[in-house]
Amino acid sequence: MNITKILNRIGYVGPLHVNLKVLSNLQHAYLCTVPFENLDIHANVKIILDEDLFYKKIVENNRGGFCYESNSLFYELLKEIGFDVSIIAARMMISDGISPGYSHMALLVKLEEDYLVDVGNGQSVRDPMPITGDVISHSEGIRYKVGEYGHNEFALFHREDNTEWSPRFVFSTARRHLEEFKVMCHYHQTSSDSVFTKQRLCTLATAKGRLTLIDNTFTINDDGEINTESVDSVEQMQEILQNHFKIKMHISDYS
């Protein structure tokens, strides 16, 4: 795994000191260059929990990935730089409650205090978040903070204007290993109940908003100004993926 190539992939040019500023800059760089996407699932390409495969896909093939892929790669990058980082397990909040354990992966980075870091979520906080809950981050019209949730757990809370704080996902700070996510990785790719099998998704943060392709709809959020277009052909979808997400791949259908 070539760290220089990972840094080139995310367009990061700067110091590699072990501090909060560098961690934040690396996170921003990653989120604005590596899409959160599940295109392989809809192309019947199996996602295997293997760091070398994640590196090949994201760095060498200029693709994105979902939480296990992106957070695993970012974990390897931070570890090589010298950060005290660990993989942690989380559970996403869903319409009828909360998802099973290991349904989401995030990272915990220890500096002067512990920070939640996540580069593998469709829309989430862009900054390292201290689990003390002392910091509120704001991006894309949403505020975020970390707080205690139940016994020995924490949650990333979010709220929009004129709404109450609600948990986006729940996590513990216990160190986990990649292979522990195997069952849920398989579930996300195969279950009809999985959000990832229900719709094709590719989304990328930008400096002022977000680019999002969901099935046959492409949306550009530019500083709150929303523009949406319908995707009516395979060729149009592939053009959007290449021009906006820098992804070159064959799309078998667009239904």
Where does each model-flagged region fall?
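Secondary-structure boundary elements
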Residues: 1-62
